[in-house]
Amino acid sequence: DTLSYHKKWMNEFLDLLIAANLNVSWTCCAAVNTVDDKDLLKKMRKSGCWNIFFGYETGVEELAENIQTNKKNRDFEKMKKIGKWTKEAGIEVRAGFLVGLPGETPALAKKTIQTAIELDPDYAQFTVCCPYPGTKLANEIHEGKWGKFITHDLKDYNMWKVTWLPFGYKNSEELKNMERYAFRKFYLRPSYVLRRILAIRSFEDIKRYIKGGRALVKGFL
């Protein structure tokens, strides 16, 4: 997320990359407030960047407050503007969103999903919030503030398994079903499916979409 934080360093790095003419393709993660520059995005594309992952996390202000995300990175209009600029520069936009945040209910989760649809990134990733041991959030859960842990097995601590249950959910299956619902709601929109079909430019694109479609069917339908 910090690659583009220092603008001077980033511009110098990109200039060197372009001058070296290495013809490399690369991706990165970035915070919204660090790429608020059209020229920087264009230079990133010229140097070979084809994809940026933004961690938007949620579309609900109170949930963002609960996990103390940077206010500069959760302004909806700014998210929308930077996403538009990134696409205009010829760079794909991938966005990450969380379900099962502290203070969340199914109704609030659906607001986050709606935010994802309105922001309309090229690809969206929805994962279950996983409070790792030793973090502030994990400590608060241990104190009974937001919900309860349902496992302490470190093998389960990843973004795909439910390790804790917020008070707003009845059980882990309800939370996991919300994650599945998010993927279906985002990816099965007719407008989205049509746009991806029209974006096909090569056989590699077809193979990539088939692979992604299989993963969607297997994991979330």
Question: Where are the regions that the model predicts?
Answer:
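A structural motif corresponding to the C-terminal lobe/cap of the Radical SAM core domain
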Residues: 4-7, 12-204
